């Protein structure tokens, strides 16, 4: 399917590291306890290169998309990610909600046009990468609710949700064909879908 352009396969960093934490030189916990450490960009680079190499060995090509571990992203990781050839990555709408647009305003994820639009993230050194943000509502319904419903009810709810997002875009004067609603699920949720 990937060779025919019907699906795009993504990679993840090897050994599932939380890259933003590895790129930081320490932080203070909510309770005030300080975590002292150096930034480990070489470790991040190693996880990325190893993951890309394994993907290519097994599948015969290098991916351009990435699912970061736990969907954790930060400006500091943009350059290491783009250095290995990644052009886009996926994260969660809660990350978008905590992000600012070019005018410095927090992004309203209740606005379908914001959530269903690929964004550009700028790295600490000026590099850029496209980021898509998963719609948590519909993704979590698939992961945790639809497995307990009849197939007909689950499909009806899914289609109704998509129609609602489409209508929100139309009401805002947007062309739905120019937007991307991202449904993304973690692997540990598969047991809830059967």
Language model segments and positions:
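Metal-dependent polysaccharide deacetylase catalytic core of the NodB/CE4 family, i.e.
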Residues: 1-68, 127-147, 178, 182, ...
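Active-site-adjacent pocket scaffolds in enzyme catalytic domains
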Residues: 69-194
């Amino acid at each position: 399917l990937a060779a025919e352009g019907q699906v795009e396969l993504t990679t993840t960093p090897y050994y599932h590291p939380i890259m933003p934490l590895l790129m930081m030189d320490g932080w203070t916990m909510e309770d005030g306890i300080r975590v002292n450490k150096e930034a480990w960009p070489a470790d991040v680079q190693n996880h990325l290169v190893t993951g890309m190499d394994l993907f290519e060995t097994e599948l015969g090509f290098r991916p351009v998309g990435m699912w970061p571990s736990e969907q954790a992203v930060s400006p500091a990781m943009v350059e290491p990610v783009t250095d290995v050839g990644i052009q886009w990555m996926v994260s969660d709408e809660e990350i978008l909600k905590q992000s600012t647009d070019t005018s410095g305003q927090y992004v309203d994820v209740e606005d379908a046009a914001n959530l269903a639009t690929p964004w550009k993230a700028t790295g600490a050194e000026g590099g850029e990468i496209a980021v898509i943000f998963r719609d948590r509502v519909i993704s979590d319904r698939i992961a945790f609710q639809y497995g307990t419903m009849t197939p007909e009810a689950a499909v009806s709810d899914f289609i109704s949700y998509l129609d609602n997002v489409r209508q929100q875009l139309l009401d805002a004067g947007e062309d739905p064909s120019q937007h991307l609603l991202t449904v993304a699920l973690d692997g540990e949720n598969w047991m809830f879908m059967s």
